[in-house]
Structure formats: C-alpha cells, structure tokens
Amino acid sequence: MTWREAESALARAELAVLPTGSIEQHGPHMALETDIAVGQALAERLAEDLGELAVLCPRIDYGLSEHHMRFPGTITLRPETFSALILDVVASLAQWGVRRVVVVNGHGGNIDALRLISRAARRDLGCLVASLMWAQVGADEISKRTSSESYGHACEIETSVAMVLAPEVVHVERVEAPSGRRSVDPLTDPPRPRVDQTVLMHEWTDDGALGDPRLYNVEDGKAIVEVVTERAVEFARRFALQPLPDLPGGIR
C-alpha cells in the first residue's frame, strides 16, 4: 500500500484492525511465530469481512512472553515497551482520523496489558481500543470440543485452530505425548485458574505444551474459527458505531 492508497483507505475507514501476538515456544511441534500467525490470519478475515469499514494495519509480532523465557527462541518485550508501541500506533492512526482500533490478539499473555492500554488510549488520546483474543471469544465453543481436562498452550485446541488458520506453523509429524506435566496449585493451574499467580511455563511442563496435542481435530478447529470470526465481525460492526470520546481524552 502506498501513502496515497493509505490516504484513501483511512478516509473511508471507521476503525483499524491491528494484529498482535508473540514469538515464543509452542511445544515440540509448533513454530515460535504461532501466536502472531494465528492473530494475523484472524485479522485478515475480519478486515476482509468489514470491507471499507476497516483498514488492516501491519502486524506487531512481539508480545509479553516472560513466562516462556526458559525455552530457546522465545523473545519478549517489557510491559512498558509493549504498551508504548501499541499506544504509538494508536496515536498515529488518530492523526489520520481513525480513532477506533480493534486489536486482534493471538497471545493470552498480552491480555492484561491490552486492558490497561485500552484505558490509556481513551484517557490520554481520546481513542477507543478494543482487543479480542480467539480463545476468549470462542470459549464456549472450545469447552464443547475439548477432549482433555488440562489444556491451554500448544494443546489439542491451539493445534486444531492453527491447522485451520496457519497450517504452516504446525509440524504434525512432531506431535508427541505430553511429558513432564506438573501442578503448581489446583487454584492456579490452567485451563481455568481461580487465583492469579505468576507461574513460569517450565514449572508446569518440560516440553512447553499444556494439554495433549495428539488429540487435535481439524474439524473442531474449523468450528471454533467460524464462531470466533462471526462474533468478531458482529462486534466490530457495532464498535464502528460507538461514539468517540471527547478530545484530548478522558474517561467518560
């Protein structure tokens, strides 16, 4: 896209779609870029369905992955770096008249930071930022299609979804039985922790996966992706009509 093409697209758009994710380990069978590849693919589907209502931004590959740093290849940002990066993108878009941003987030570790970023964007920039993560948007569909009690990372669910959205990141010939699973505490363990505690991934698992990827099912992945895409599009169309905050900002 040239600057003149961008000028036309931004003039028509009511919102921007921004893909984010992470570069981190995903067990023995999935690539380091799994999260951003999935986030990018979902963002492309969303932007395509929205048409001229939205403009698709270049993706932000890196995210918050401190808890995976014992596994080689993982690259993490500090929370303040991640926040500054997203907010600078939002501020730049606002300069060109787009003050609503939907962050299509492929990484669960970014969720808490994105909540704070949304507040800061409204307070300091007068912009609306919404973030959606596929595992949250489709949580009810996922629960119907889960075969094991423990899942959450490089598991049958994430493998199934990636096989649909970004099959190039999945090496099915390397899928293996779970190894070295441990409980830290029943109330902090995935997939539904009841107590917030910082736990590092290597304290739960030796191979970097939580769940059994051998149980992946492409048809389940298709069903989850269909539900997530439909809900994301419905939300984005409503979001595009939400009134903007007063400038220069402020929680209203």
Language-model segment annotations:
Residues M1-V102, G108-R252:
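Extended, histidine- and acidic-residue-enriched regions that form the cofactor-binding/catalytic faces
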